[in-house]
């Protein structure tokens, strides 16, 4: 999700996934590769041993006019690639992991470049579970000199669990004294519908 944070509790969603979230795509590809859950950290570790150019996976919506993303086609391309391989050994798994990680990162970088061009923002915060991925962090850090921006990340200890990040934001929005709050519960709640 790409969000323009104008002020505390003032958000505008500029782009989002049309299907799988980035972390969800990592988890699903991890499962296809027989890796433990969650897949993200295991793909990152395996990718270190692989060639990111071994497989030319698609970069869905990378050139679209909007800032939305779609990763289900990429995930499906990985599935079809795996199904064609008779002996899925560790070296091949590493190449698939590295190529997948690069494809996802290429899409993220392209969308952020487009965001900066459109919004003229100079600060980018990379957050969520995949913000712990060192490859993704490095690629975003490389944008600083190219786009004259500053990239920020939460400490790694806050990246592994979206619930912790959400709870932290909730604590910032809540008054210090205890309250009896009545609220509806929704599995998916658009960020721009939250109010203080």
Name each model feature, range by range.
Residues 1-3:
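Beta-strand/loop-alpha-helix module characteristic of Rossmann-like adenine-cofactor folds
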Residues 5-51, 75-76, 80-86:
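Glycine-rich phosphate-binding loop plus the immediately following alpha-helix
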Residues 124, 141-165:
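Conserved phosphate-binding/catalytic loops in two-lobed NTP-binding clefts
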Residues 45-124, 133-147, 174-177, 192-196:
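A contiguous, well-structured pocket-lining segment that forms one wall/lid of small-molecule binding clefts
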Residues 154-195:
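Glycine-rich phosphate-binding/hydrolytic loop that grips phosphoryl groups
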Residues 12-17, 63-66, 150-159:
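A short glycine/serine-rich beta->alpha loop
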């Amino acid at each position: 999700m790409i969000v323009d944070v104008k002020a505390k509790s003032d958000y505008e969603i500029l782009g989002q996934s049309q299907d799988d979230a980035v972390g969800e795509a990592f988890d699903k590809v991890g499962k296809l590769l027989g890796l433990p859950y969650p897949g993200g950290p295991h793909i990152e570790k395996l990718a270190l041993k692989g060639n990111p150019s071994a497989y030319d996976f698609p970069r869905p919506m990378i050139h679209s006019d909007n800032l939305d993303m779609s990763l289900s086609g990429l995930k499906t391309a990985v599935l079809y690639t795996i199904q064609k391989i008779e002996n899925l050994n560790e070296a091949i798994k590493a190449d698939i992991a590295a190529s997948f990680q690069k494809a996802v990162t290429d899409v993220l970088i392209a969308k952020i470049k487009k965001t900066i061009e459109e919004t003229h923002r100079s600060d980018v915060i990379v957050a969520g579970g995949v913000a712990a991925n060192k490859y993704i962090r490095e690629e975003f850090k490389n944008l600083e000199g190219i786009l004259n921006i500053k990239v920020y990340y939460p400490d790694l200890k806050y990246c592994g669990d979206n619930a912790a990040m959400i709870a932290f934001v909730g604590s910032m929005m809540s008054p210090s004294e205890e309250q009896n709050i009545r609220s509806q519960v929704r599995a998916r709640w658009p960020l721009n519908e939250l109010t203080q």
